[in-house]
Amino acid sequence: MTDELDDIHPILQGAPQTTEFRKLRKRIVRNVREALDQYGMVDGRDARWLVCLSGGKDSFTLLAALIELKWRGLLPVELLACNLDQGQPGFPATVLPEFLARMGIPHRIEYQDTYSIVVDKIPQGRTYCSLCSRLRRGNLYRIAREEGCSAIVLGHHRDDILETFFMNLFHGGRLATMPPKLVNEEGDLFVYRPLAFVAEADCERFARSMNYPIIPCDLCGSQDGLQRQQVKQILDGWEARSPGRRQVMFRALMNARPSHLLDPGLFDFAGLATGTASGRNGAEPPQLRGGD
């Protein structure tokens, strides 16, 4: 991958020319490409993706990485950036369309006042995030169908995935998280998370260094759920005491051993017999490359 200024998409023009930033940018693009490859997000057929742009650091990083891969001929997919303006008070409605137009990026801006619905349905003092997310997802599915897209692409990163795993573990009693690739309930659209291998800190450093017009995520006045905040604090503490712990825990999500857990739906314990090799239950899963 080259970094020559005359061979770069406008979304990356003006990038810092420091060695540190070049390494950061290459790491992000490499991690995104690995996720795309490892989880089969690009199948070789003509495809159109709806890339969801909230205006936060993560979605800007996602869009820039996908555009760079496409610009360099490594992502044979048509990209359509989409922002859903949900009617939150104070949302700067002109920021994203002006940015996308200036960058020459195909886009769709959709206004749907889901904020009023959420305020009406959620008791005062409760977080809006869950219902807001469901309403947003439904609208994004609709837009994807209207635009002839085969997938919607979201900006959840490694830390989001890890936090969701521990939220399910601590509060839901199950081993589950956000998968990097899934099919929606209707069965007609893929949902991709190409930032699955990218650390939140890398998204933060990248978007800030590029001076993208980041829009705060708390315009509605509701903070992210208390459970997620608590999990984030726990993970921050572990990382502070043992640097690199997040990456090790994330790698564990790619190295599951059903025969060493307790779910008979995943492993036939009742049918286990002597005379055969002990059940690693299949080949060693692939290991994460790259990382922090």
From Swiss-Prot:
Q: How is the cofactor bound?
A: Binds 1 [4Fe-4S] cluster per subunit. The cluster is chelated by three Cys residues, the fourth Fe has a free coordination site that may bind a sulfur atom transferred from the persulfide of IscS.
Domain of life of the native organism: Bacteria
Q: Which cofactors does this gene product need?
A: Mg(2+); [4Fe-4S] cluster
One of the GO BP terms on file: tRNA thio-modification
What Pfam families does the record point to?
ATP_bind_3 (PF01171)
Recorded catalytic activity of this chain's protein? cytidine(32) in tRNA + S-sulfanyl-L-cysteinyl-[cysteine desulfurase] + AH2 + ATP = 2-thiocytidine(32) in tRNA + L-cysteinyl-[cysteine desulfurase] + A + AMP + diphosphate + H(+)
Pathway annotation from the record: tRNA modification
Q: Enumerate the Gene3D superfamilies for this protein.
A: HUPs
EC class of the enzyme, as a word: transferase
Its keywords, alphabetically, are: 4Fe-4S, ATP-binding, Cytoplasm, Iron, Iron-sulfur, Magnesium, Metal-binding, Nucleotide-binding, RNA-binding, Transferase, tRNA processing, tRNA-binding
Task: Please give one Gene Ontology molecular function term for this protein.
Answer: tRNA binding
Chain sites annotated for binding [4Fe-4S] cluster? C129, C132, C220
E.C. code: 2.8.1.-
Gene Ontology CC: one annotated term: cytoplasm
Subcellular localization is given as: Cytoplasm
Is Lipid metabolism among the key words of this record? no
Sequence motif PP-loop motif, residues = 54-59
- Other information: The thiolation reaction likely consists of two steps: a first activation step by ATP to form an adenylated intermediate of the target base of tRNA, and a second nucleophilic substitution step of the sulfur (S) atom supplied by the hydrosulfide attached to the Fe-S cluster.
To which protein family does this belong? Belongs to the TtcA family.
Relate the protein's function as given in its record.
Catalyzes the ATP-dependent 2-thiolation of cytidine in position 32 of tRNA, to form 2-thiocytidine (s(2)C32). The sulfur atoms are provided by the cysteine/cysteine desulfurase (IscS) system.
Q: How does it assemble?
A: Homodimer.
Q: What is this protein called?
A: tRNA-cytidine(32) 2-sulfurtransferase
Query: Which organism does this sequence originate in?
Result: Cereibacter sphaeroides (strain ATCC 17025 / ATH 2.4.3)
- Give me the gene this protein comes from: ttcA
